From Swiss-Prot:
Changing residue 786 to A: Loss of kinase activity. The lineage of its organism: Eukaryota, Metazoa, Chordata, Craniata, Vertebrata. SMART domains: C1, S_TKc. This is Kinase suppressor of Ras 2. Residues 531-548 have a biased composition (Pro residues). ATP binds at residues 672-680, 788, 803. Residues 239-296, 498-556 are annotated as: Disordered. The modification Phosphothreonine is found at residues 272, 276, 497. Residues 666-931 form the Protein kinase domain. InterPro entries: C1-like_sf (IPR046349), Kinase-like_dom_sf (IPR011009), KSR_SAM-like_dom (IPR025561), PE/DAG-bd (IPR002219), Prot_kinase_dom (IPR000719), SAM/pointed_sf (IPR013761), SAM_KSR1_N (IPR046861), SAM_KSR1_N_sf (IPR046933). Mainly expressed in brain and kidney. The gene is KSR2.
């Protein structure tokens, strides 16, 4: 029942008591279900995720509609006809659950003492006074007033508002973040201390440090007006604000200007008159007399700026303004300009330490631009050149022993999703389990704190050539590739030239002594189509077509060929409809059938044979260890070609240690499943779990590396339709993956149970749950690669997906197989996309197949077919026929199943021959929602039960 479909005439006509009660109870059931889902999203899901936030907003809007619907139904009944049961709607305790009011407050309110209608008739002040009597705090009062205001507007408008007006506008805190039940207010806001222009400019550099600090503990919002440089060539922080003047909080535009520095500003020194001090009027501050510059005026040390010359004015009583000259956009091949670095007696290094401000010291100045607390050299500045130039700006030399982060490029953060056992957000200072981490500057913060994060900067380190600075990307550390000989830090020299901004050298080297290493997703596998087959030789005998089908719109395909012909073309399977192209140096296309020495025919040449593995009932694995993510990177060996640096323990190894479970702590029970990835046992580890044992050779480094790589991919998945990963045993020879124990039966057995009725509504609900889980995995950059009904568990309407990503280690686990055999499990071929079928070969490992997001969509189409046909496609045909038909894009006869047009359209979309034509899981969800619903008839027993309750 959707209130949007209700006409105005229905809204205005009165209702009888019985009908109003029936509608209120029906809406109440929907409220109970929505509140349960809402609380699950708030407590069990990562609320910093954008998708979770969107789902929460949608549920809140629906609940507002439902409560408005109950109020409308109650309003249509005359006062004299109402009874106590109708007066109980809408229920105040359910509204308090939406607002996330504490249970202690609800317990203080006696039944019938306060109603939601009473609160709607009160003002905001009266609401606060009323609920504060029962123990509510100010935050709860603010949220309650915001929710009541939304409900009041919706109810008064009669439901004619736009969708945006249905959303509860939660109040904001002082830090500008929403005070909603998902994002609670922060007790201590992130204090951003920026540099501000002083109303008066002192005449000496020393006076730049003589000021009073602001009140301790108070947030300091000081806008960056300009950076002043004294007549001495040393870089000095700007002077402070005089006592009696308070700094202005930055406007949203100014905050954006601070966080988004220019790409290639030029720095020139010009004379600037003293700024005008701010004026006070009625306890409010006016903007300074001198308007603040735009974001392009901010100073940032990035490539492309001109040489710094001393101002022609020698009046030391005037400050020198660092401004930007108007220059066109930097081109890719623009020649880098030189920055000569000297030491000078006028530099800030020579200022006595007791005269330096703790707020505007050189450390805070640099940390403001870079976003990190840099290391300061403990040695005095060293002159890098004997000859001094009067027109160059002198700055202290860097310490050669410590890599610096002082110079960096203002670029966008490269965030990746992370999971920590215990971590603190750099921005807001609060603890977090889920969050984001920048791969460049290692910033760690909540998803909601990214807008407040400081700008990102790449580390610039020195190569052996003293004339260049080399910008390097963040280089990951492979968990199994040891680093080689460390360099001597004495080889690092001061640079006099900045590199080109848009050109990265091939000989980049890793960053020394980074706090940790980050990674790129390695869960996804590139989907590269195989090279087409060469043409048939003229001497080859044209074979007869295999399984001709009237459904195939393509020409008839030739199938049986002599094995010698395959060997001649490097064991390649021939699809005659493919246009031949010359062979390339890349890996040659592979054959999918295997030569054997028995049954010789065709002039003694052996036929090619496929080995089909029998189906095992224990093949259904009771659940799978997975928790995956987007953040494991392979080592870029080209970056290690020149030299390697010693590093601290990598973040990857730290994560593996956190998820490592000692094998001795596991209690292994009975065997519950056996598949291609190992045996699965029922066990106990702080409760019931599923334990999958992985059998690999003790000295096989490839197998161990593949296993650890998959564990790194599993550790960050958190979704109700994805099995929960709990840990892994990573000490050979005991390798195991531990997950939660899935309840219910596999979808494979449910579909084939004749006692279970699968109507359109149930099949759509199952498919929607699978699409939700797969869409989540794809959003995290994870491919399933083995999606089938045996890897999906179904229990009372809940669907859980298992075994995702484990296909990557299946190839190395079958190292002992015969080289001329292609092992195919029963029912596996019908889940493979045509582009994968064409790549099958006995000499191609299964983890090297071109799996992609499109191939997962194809596998979902097979499950969709199985839900309606209750069997696999091409069930009665041999493996050779299935390979041929699916490799050429042929499909089974759908008319024999009796599918509707809408159902078959979804299937044909998923089974599209061209992978680009297959829909995404997001689009599939929309298609499933548009399927016609089968409503119950009025004679359905459920309606009689409802009337009996009334």
């Amino acid at each position: 029942m959707d209130e949007e479909n209700m006409t105005k005439s229905e809204e205005q006509q009165p209702l009888s008591l019985q009908k109003a009660l029936q509608q209120c109870e029906l809406v109440q059931n929907m409220i109970d279900l929505s509140i349960s889902n809402l609380e699950g999203l708030r407590t069990k899901c990562a609320t910093s995720n954008d998708l979770t936030q969107k789902e929460i907003r949608t549920l809140e809007s629906k609940l507002v509609k439902y409560f408005s619907r109950q109020l409308s139904c109650k309003k249509k009944v005359a006062l004299q006809e109402r009874n106590a049961e109708l007066d109980g709607f809408p229920q105040l305790r359910h509204w308090f659950r939406i607002v996330d009011v504490r249970k202690e407050v609800l317990e203080e309110i006696s039944p019938g003492q306060l109603s939601l209608e009473d609160l709607l008739e009160m003002t905001d002040e009266q609401v606060c006074e009323t609920v504060e009597k029962y123990g509510a705090n100010r935050e709860e009062c603010a949220r309650l007033n915001a929710s009541l205001s939304c409900l009041r507007n919706v109810h008064m408008s009669g439901g004619n508002l736009s969708k945006q007006d249905w959303t509860i506008q939660w109040p904001t805190t002082e830090t500008g973040k929403e005070n909603n039940p998902v994002c609670p207010p922060e007790p201590t806001p992130w204090i951003r201390t920026h540099l501000s222009q002083s109303p008066r400019v002192p005449s000496k550099c020393v006076q730049h440090y003589c000021h009073t600090s602001p009140t301790p503990g108070a947030p300091v919002y000081t806008h960056v007006d300009r950076l002043t440089v004294d007549a001495y060539p040393g870089l000095c922080p700007p002077p402070p604000l005089e006592s009696g003047h308070r700094s202005l909080p930055p406007s949203p535009r100014q905050r954006h200007a601070v966080r988004t520095p220019p790409r290639t500003p030029n720095i020139v020194t010009t004379v600037t008159p003293p700024g005008t001090p701010p004026m006070r009027k009625k306890n409010k501050l006016k903007p300074p007399g001198t308007p603040p510059p735009s974001s392009r005026k901010l100073i940032h040390l990035i490539p492309g700026f001109t040489a710094l010359h001393r101002s022609k004015s020698h009046e030391f009583q005037l400050g020198h303004r660092v401004d930007e000259a108007h220059t066109p956009k930097a081109k890719k091949k623009s020649k880098p300009l030189n920055l000569k670095i000297h030491s000078s007696v006028g530099s800030c290094e020579n200022i006595p330490s007791q005269q330096r401000s703790p707020l505007l010291s050189e450390r805070s100045l640099r940390s403001f631009f870079v976003g990190h607390a840099p290391f300061l050299p403990s040695t005095p500045p060293v002159h890098t050149e004997a000859n001094f130039s009067a027109n160059t700006l002198s700055v202290p030399r860097w310490s050669p022993q410590i890599p610096r982060r002082d110079l960096g490029n203002s670029i966008k953060h490269r965030f990746s999703t992370k999971y920590w056992m215990s971590q603190t957000c750099t921005v807001c200072g609060k603890g977090m389990l889920f969050g984001l981490k920048c791969k460049n500057c290692k910033l760690k913060c909540h998803n909601k704190c990214t807008k407040e994060a400081p700008p990102c900067h790449l580390l610039i380190i020195h190569r052996g050539d003293p004339a260049r600075l080399v910008r390097t990307e963040s280089v990951p550390c492979d968990i199994n590739n040891p680093l080689r000989k460390p360099p001597r830090y004495s080889d690092l020299h001061i640079s006099q030239t900045l590199p080109k901004t848009n050109k990265i050298n091939k000989d980049h080297i890793p960053v020394p002594y980074q706090p940790d290493s980050s990674s790129n997703p390695s869960s996804t596998t590139s989907s590269t189509p195989s090279s087409p087959a060469p043409p048939l030789p003229p001497s080859a005998t044209p074979p007869s077509p295999l399984h001709p089908s009237p459904q195939c719109t393509r020409q008839q395909k030739n199938f049986n060929l002599p094995a010698s012909h395959y060997y001649k073309y490097k064991q390649q399977f021939i699809f005659p409809d493919v246009v031949p192209v010359p062979e390339t140096p890349t890996r040659a296309p592979q054959v999918i059938l295997h030569p054997v020495t028995s049954n010789p025919i065709l002039e003694g040449n052996p036929l090619l044979q496929i080995e089909v593995e029998p189906t095992s009932e224990n093949e259904e694995v009771h659940d799978e260890a997975e928790e995956s993510e987007d953040d494991f990177e392979e080592m870029n060996l080209s970056l290690l070609s020149a030299r390697s640096f010693p590093r601290k323990a990598s973040q990857t190894s730290i994560f593996l240690q956190e998820w490592d479970i000692p094998f001795e702590q596991l209690e292994i029970g009975e065997l519950i499943g056996k598949g291609r990835f190992g045996q699965v046992y029922h066990g106990r580890w702080h409760g019931e779990v599923a334990i999958r044992l992985i059998d690999i050779e003790r000295d096989n480094e490839d197998q161990l590396k593949a296993f650890k790589r998959e564990v790194m991919a599993y550790r960050q998945t958190r979704h109700e339709n994805v099995v929960l990963f709990m840990g892994a045993c990573m000490s050979p020879p005991h390798l195991a993956i531990i997950t939660s124990l899935c309840k219910g039966r596999t979808l494979y057995s449910v579909v084939r149970d004749a006692k279970i009725v699968l109507d359109v509504n149930k099949t759509r609900q199952i498919a929607q749950e699978i699409v939700k889980g797969m869409g989540y995995l794809h959003a995290k950059g994870i491919l399933h690669k083995d999606l089938k009904s045996k890897n999906v568990f179904y229990d009372n309407g809940k669907v859980v997906i298992t075994d995702f990503g484990l296909f990557s280690i299946s190839g190395v686990l079958q190292a002992g197989r015969r080289e001329d055999k292609l092992r195919i499990q029963n029912g596996w071929l019908c889940h493979l996309a045509p582009e994968i079928i064409r790549q099958l070969s006995p000499d191609t490992e299964e983890d090297k197949l071109p799996f992609s997001k499109h191939s997962d969509v194809f596998a979902l189409g097979t499950i969709w077919y199985e839900l309606h046909a209750r069997e696999w496609p091409f069930k009665t045909q041999p493996a050779e026929a299935i390979i041929w038909q699916m490799g050429t894009g042929m499909k089974p006869n759908l008319s024999q199943i009796g599918m509707g047009k809408e159902i078959s359209d979804i299937l044909l979309f998923c089974w599209a021959f061209e992978q680009e034509e297959r829909p995404t899981f997001t689009k599939l969800m929309d298609m499933l929602e548009k399927l016609p619903k089968r409503n119950r008839r009025l004679s359905h027993p459920g309606h009689f039960w409802k009337s009996a309750e009334l």
